[in-house]
From Swiss-Prot:
This is Quinolinate synthase. [4Fe-4S] cluster binds at C82, C168, C264. The lineage of its organism: Archaea, Thermoproteota, Thermoprotei, Thermoproteales, Thermoproteaceae. The keyword Cytoplasm applies. GO terms for biological process: 'de novo' NAD biosynthetic process from L-aspartate. It comes from Pyrobaculum aerophilum (strain ATCC 51768 / DSM 7523 / JCM 9630 / CIP 104966 / NBRC 100827 / IM2). GO terms for cellular component: cytoplasm. Pathway: Cofactor biosynthesis; NAD(+) biosynthesis; quinolinate from iminoaspartate: step 1/1. SUPFAM superfamilies: NadA-like. The gene is nadA. Its EC number is 2.5.1.72. Catalyzes the condensation of iminoaspartate with dihydroxyacetone phosphate to form quinolinate. Binds 1 [4Fe-4S] cluster per subunit.
Length: 307
């Protein structure tokens, strides 16, 4: 079977497979680590493997390559892009900096290496609030590229933030009316929302008026939360692939997607067959030019200080 062959190749080649929470179940089945962007970046930084197969989208594999310049980082499908990462370029950031010379650029991890290289900090949804709150109040904050995450940060911290106009096309379709409709159907459910969602700010303001206390969490935060919560039913507002992970980690509970169509087609490009071929033939290596990697590494390492 293909699964057993992948496991055999991992042992022979001293390889590790890192799989994002949104990956297909068949890919998670052969992964050594499953997690969100922050956790997988940390695993990539400390792995002793010679080969890293990154089952995720391209910017994630780039981050692993930046942190492991001497290791072979493979992505099973180099076409696994990201609409959010593609919404901003290094040239855009440099022009933004020119207009705000005293600004501190905070780049969400969903950006390509060239953008990280011209940013001061990289953040994830798990540590963005800590990073923003650590920036001196007299320095303007330039946050990119996700406008919904930026608005959430602005609402939570009270900081004036200049926000880039980008979005994740998957999370953008998770709207406040969709959340409200699910709440009416499942009144006993806890509501867990990824801060990239299009509903974020509205839910932050409106749901408490309905007597609800929505939890805004990274995908890894969702996993931790459902494991310790006494609740038996949850409305999950993020890409639907996380539900498989939740069922693995906290079985016996009910997980209702806020939007059944919240599916990242880029994540789903990675299949078990492609993982097998990439590992067997050691193809689709991700290499970041050293001049870009060196600068991007600084911003990524600052992110780890707030992990």
């Amino acid at each position: 079977m293909l699964k057993e062959e992948v496991l055999r190749l991992k042992r022979e080649k001293n390889a590790v497979i890192l799989a994002h929470n949104y990956q297909l179940p068949e890919v998670k089945d052969v992964a050594d680590f499953i997690g969100d962007s922050l956790n997988l970046s940390m695993e990539a930084a400390r792995t002793k493997a010679d080969i890293i197969v990154f089952a995720g989208v391209y910017f994630m594999a780039e981050t692993a390559a930046i942190l492991n310049p001497d290791k072979k980082v493979l992505i099973p499908d180099p076409g696994a892009g990201c609409s959010l990462a593609s919404s901003v370029s290094a040239a855009d950031v440099l022009e933004w900096r020119r207009r705000h010379p005293n600004g501190v650029v905070v780049a969400y991890i969903n950006t390509y290496a060239e953008v990280k290289a011209v940013s001061d900090y990289v953040c994830t949804s798990a540590n963005c609030l800590k990073i923003i709150e650590a920036i001196p109040s007299d320095r303007p904050v330039l946050f990119l590229p996700d406008k919904y995450l930026g608005l959430y940060i602005k609402a939570k911290t009270g900081r004036e933030i200049d926000i880039w106009d980008g979005e994740c096309h998957v999370h953008a379709k998770i709207t406040s009316p969709k959340i409200t409709a699910k709440i009416k159907l499942y009144r006993d459910a806890e509501v867990l929302i990824h801060p990239e969602c299009g509903c974020g700010t509205a839910c932050l303001l409106e749901l408490p008026k309905m007597g609800l206390s929505p939890k805004f969490l990274s995908t890894e935060g969702m996993v931790k939360y459902v494991k310790q919560s006494p609740a038996r039913r949850f409305i999950i507002a993020t890409e639907v692939g996380i539900i498989d992970r939740l069922e693995r980690e906290a079985p016996g509970k009910e997980y209702i997607p806020a939007a059944e169509d919240a599916i990242c087609e880029y994540m789903k490009l990675i299949t078990l067959d492609k993982v097998h071929r990439s590992l067997k033939e050691e193809i689709y290596r991700v290499v970041v030019p050293e001049d870009i990697a060196k600068k991007a590494r600084l911003a990524i390492e600052r992110m780890f200080e707030f992990a």
